[in-house]
């Protein structure tokens, strides 16, 4: 789908269907997006921004609650890079997630980052209250204490298998924003 907007730039968004927040795969999807785009050493930043210089910015993130969610990939191609070229490069990186296992070092780095973010987030009482309210909504307030363990339990094999199920054209909706001339 193509949309035009008067902001003078080009933008690409892909959305893949994924599980809801209470499904065990939710943690796998979250780790996948962290591997792809969380930090300067993430795959998208290293390959698509720094090495190939195809994007000025690119991100992968999940949205989901009690309903089924989406795994989003959004990016702004460098001027002169076509949307088709940008899309092809993203699919190539997603294909690697399906075919090449994540290294233990890369997986441990993402797990450590998540755990440290949780520790720092729990310093703020508002964050704790918000998270506790969400888990109370699900009927399992005590699950708030299990989050880090659920992320720590994610394996490279789960990441590869979930990527293989998720990153297929039939599971993807694509939106291109084109600048109005």
Residue spans of the language-model regions?
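Short, charged, low-complexity patches
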Residues: 25-29, 33, 41, 83-87
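Short beta-alpha junctions and helix-cap segments that line functional grooves
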Residues: 31, 60, 162-163
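Extracellular/periplasmic catalytic domains that process cell-envelope and extracellular macromolecules
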Residues: 166-168
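Short, conserved catalytic/metal-binding micro-motifs enriched in Asp/Glu and His
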Residues: 30, 159, 174
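M16 family metallopeptidases and their MPP-like homologs
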Residues: 12-19, 46-99, 104-153, 170-179
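Low-complexity, intrinsically disordered Gly/Pro/Thr-rich segments
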Residues: 156-164
């Amino acid at each position: 789908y193509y949309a035009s907007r008067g902001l003078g730039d080009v933008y690409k968004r892909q959305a893949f269907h994924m599980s809801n927040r209470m499904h065990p795969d939710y943690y796998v999807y979250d780790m996948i997006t962290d591997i792809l785009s969380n930090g300067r050493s993430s795959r998208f930043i290293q390959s698509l921004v720094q090495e190939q210089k195809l994007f000025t910015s690119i991100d992968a993130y999940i949205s989901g609650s009690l309903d089924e969610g989406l795994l989003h990939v959004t990016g702004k191609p460098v001027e002169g890079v076509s949307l088709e070229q940008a899309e092809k490069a993203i699919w190539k990186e997603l294909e690697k997630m399906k075919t090449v296992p994540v290294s233990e070092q890369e997986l441990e780095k993402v797990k450590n980052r998540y755990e440290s973010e949780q520790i720092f987030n729990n310093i703020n009482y508002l964050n704790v209250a918000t998270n506790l309210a969400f888990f109370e909504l699900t009927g399992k307030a005590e699950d708030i204490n299990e989050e880090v363990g659920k992320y720590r339990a994610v394996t490279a094999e789960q990441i590869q298998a979930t990527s293989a199920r998720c990153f297929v054209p039939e599971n993807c909706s694509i939106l291109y924003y084109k600048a109005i001339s």
